[in-house]
Amino acid sequence: MALYGNFERSLDPKNRLSLPAKFKTELGSNFYLSVLLDGVVEIRNSEEFENEAHKFKTMNVLDKNARDFARLFFQRTVEVEADKQGRFVLPKHILEKASIQKDVVLVGMGDKVELWSKAKYDSFQDSIDDEKIENIAFKLKESGVEF
């Protein structure tokens, strides 16, 4: 799966969002929305969701952090179904957790799509410059991540 690029969209009055054609094919008509890190909605197709959910089955149940994270992951995940036009309803609790009001940005992240409130996305983009990108890349390389 190769999800990439970013697309700006707006919710309609019924809190429906239309997926870009590029993402519709990869995500299918049923997919999962999760809000955990950075207040960003992660959208996964069924296969990727099952892969992610499987990781929790292998966690140490004696580790409180692992239990808490698993609870949050499953509590903050919802399955949605897109209509024939590729629109789906964003549930109220997802909108609230992600601070989404109307305008959003969908960002392809390889195996998933991130859904940002436009205001939060713009703020993130404004905080990034070439020097920060180099620093991030250097720190990742130091921790063993290869590019």
UniProtKB/Swiss-Prot annotation:
Subcellular location as annotated: Cytoplasm, Nucleoid
Keyword Transmembrane helix carried by entry: no
Gene3D superfamilies: Transcriptional regulator MraZ domain
MF terms (GO), sorted A to Z: DNA-binding transcription factor activity; transcription cis-regulatory region binding
One Pfam match: MraZ
GO biological process: negative regulation of DNA-templated transcription initiation
UniProt keyword annotation of Transmembrane present: no
Protein family: Belongs to the MraZ family.
The protein's name: Transcriptional regulator MraZ
Organism: Mycoplasmopsis pulmonis (strain UAB CTIP) (Mycoplasma pulmonis)
